[in-house]
Amino acid sequence: MRHCGDCTLCCKLLPVHDGVLINGKRMQGNLDKAAGERCRYQRHTGCKVYNTALMPTCCKMWNCRWLGNDDTGDLSRPDRSHYVIDIMPDYVTVVDNTTGNQQKVEVVQIWIDPKYPDAHRDPALRRWLERKGRMALVRFNSSDAIHLMPPSVASDGQWHELDGKSEGREHSLTEIVDALST
């Protein structure tokens, strides 16, 4: 079993919104921080509130993919690779424009340390994504991201980094609803 050691990268990169919704209004929890901000409970030796009543629920539920050690043997510890992998229960459908074949692909979030903006190009990470057949939403902060598509998903068998910005026309509401309902 792997251990965090002095790695606290998840405490820096992940957003933590520990407040609760009451009558549609967000009430402040004991911690509310944006992605990329250091947690106020973080110390050089780790988390000051780890396994205490003050530990935010989302931190208790966080499951570092590297710690899992089941399928990440060739990945470096997050503070050395400069990213954390967040397994999302989300999928996208990729359609081959030539054949019309559809493929349902799992998506993971990869939170990148802003000091290392090319960390998502780590060969070990790309091998892991390719082996698992997963796409990645590479998050640089709460609002900036790209999609990383491995060759096993792309119709041309190449890696693709997609910024999500469309240079073409905008889609109508009807087109969006039709696309979502298929």
Enumerate the predicted regions with their spans.
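Short loop/turn segments that flank or connect secondary-structure elements
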Residues: 1-182
